[in-house]
């Protein structure tokens, strides 16, 4: 995905994986692809990481005509991103997201949002990042940041646009994932949809949907979804221990559950 992004922009990678410093091969590969790498403690979720990058590279961003803030919640690209970036540049809006959501207040989903020069130079944009707090609870972060920032930018007179959805309600990337890909050319698949699927959406056809468009990506997702060998051995030991019964008590079964 980084290789695809760098076709259209300089990539600044922010990572909370402190152990990355001790993996020289991985770091070398990333340095070949990224304009800068920031390694920091995991504070403030995505917005804390973006704030750190914006602060460290303020000079470059002040001169930028275009900025995209995105996270690692996507698998992709399902198809090349040429069409997406053409639409981003062609949009008359100042702030462009991929999807929107009506929860709490109409806003753009924060997983991928592009800001044009007018937004970057807007006083409300700078004030938001300067005064941003590290919210310990994700629910508070969603209200104050994912919802709060678009609301403040709209109030400041900026124009906002969602490219793939209009007035969506809830996590459209879960309940409408297939339609978005097949009918609208959405180039990503949400990681949490396959790893966790909290609302039990029908996802059985994802290998075909993705495989028809990007077989290499489908194979990579399959590999990442496989439980690690050490985890499998742990689960097997737990099953053997908990499934033993002397006929006097209840029986418990633990099944593996992937965690993001």
What residues fall within each predicted segment?
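ER/Golgi luminal nucleotide-sugar-dependent glycosyltransferases, focusing on the catalytic module
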Residues: 1-260
